[in-house]
Every structure is written in C-alpha cells, then in structure tokens.
Amino acid sequence: MALPLKVLSRSMASAAKGDHGGAGANTWRLLTFVLALPGVALCSLNCWMHAGHHERPEFIPYHHLRIRTKPFAWGDGNHTLFHNPHVNPLPTGYEHP
C-alpha cells in the first residue's frame, strides 16, 4: 500500500522528472533581453537627456543647518572638505561663481 504512494509522490518531484529547469532559464533570458536591458537603456537615456536642466533652489537660511561652532582645519575654515560651490551653500548663502 505504501509503495504506490511513494511512486506517486516521486513522480511529482522535478528531480525525478529529469528536467532541470531549462524552460525557466530560457524564460528569464528572454525577459532579460526583451524587457530589462531596453528598460535600463531607456531610463539611462532619460537621465542623460535631463541632466543639465536643474535650477538652483532658493536659499533658505534654516537655523539648524550649516552650524559652524569652530572653523574647519583646512582652507578658510568656512568651506567643508569636499565643498562644491554649485550645489553646497555656505551659512550665508550660495557662492557666486
């Protein structure tokens, strides 16, 4: 009685069938080349086309940001180590390039 149940249960297993997922691999390969790679290419193109269209936001001097209790040890003491004048404002506002 136990033998037919065991034979039936092993026939449901994928390892007993001998198929190692070749159809699943082909499906994922197709999805990668048809959907994923063109999607990444379109998103990259969109980012590249709109990269230079950003305007500098208005400076609002919040009292809890850019607090300088002592000067930095480099430069004039007011600029951070990796200061970028295009995007990083000083406590008084943006620098004019």
From Swiss-Prot:
State the membrane topology.
Single-pass membrane protein
Among its keywords, does the record have NAD? no
- Membrane-crossing segments per the record: 26-46
A GO molecular-function annotation: oxidoreductase activity
Pathway(s) this gene product operates in, as recorded in its UniProt entry: Energy metabolism; oxidative phosphorylation
Q: Where is the transit peptide?
A: 1-12
Q: Indicate whether Transmembrane appears among the record's keywords.
A: yes
Q: What is its main location?
A: mitochondrion
Q: Which Gene3D superfamilies match?
A: Cytochrome c oxidase, subunit VIa
Per its UniProt record, what PROSITE patterns does this chain match? Answer: COX6A
> What does the record note as the disruption phenotype of the gene behind this chain?
Knockout mice show significant decline of COX activity and assembly in skeletal muscle. In particular, complexes IV, IV(2) and III(2)IV(2), and supercomplex I(1)III(2)IV(1) are reduced, whereas levels of complexes I, II, and III are normal.
Alphabetically ordered keywords of this record: Membrane, Mitochondrion, Mitochondrion inner membrane, Oxidoreductase, Transit peptide, Transmembrane, Transmembrane helix
Q: Which SUPFAM superfamilies match?
A: Mitochondrial cytochrome c oxidase subunit VIa
Which stretch is the leader sequence?
none
So which stretches are on the Mitochondrial matrix side?
Answer: 13-25
**One term under GO cellular component:** mitochondrion
Q: Please give the subunit comment from the record.
A: Component of the cytochrome c oxidase (complex IV, CIV), a multisubunit enzyme composed of 14 subunits. The complex is composed of a catalytic core of 3 subunits MT-CO1, MT-CO2 and MT-CO3, encoded in the mitochondrial DNA, and 11 supernumerary subunits COX4I, COX5A, COX5B, COX6A, COX6B, COX6C, COX7A, COX7B, COX7C, COX8 and NDUFA4, which are encoded in the nuclear genome.
Primary role = Component of the cytochrome c oxidase, the last enzyme in the mitochondrial electron transport chain which drives oxidative phosphorylation. The respiratory chain contains 3 multisubunit complexes succinate dehydrogenase (complex II, CII), ubiquinol-cytochrome c oxidoreductase (cytochrome b-c1 complex, complex III, CIII) and cytochrome c oxidase (complex IV, CIV), that cooperate to transfer electrons derived from NADH and succinate to molecular oxygen, creating an electrochemical gradient over the inner membrane that drives transmembrane transport and the ATP synthase.
Name of the featured protein: Cytochrome c oxidase subunit 6A2, mitochondrial
Q: What is the lineage of its organism?
A: Eukaryota, Metazoa, Chordata, Craniata, Vertebrata
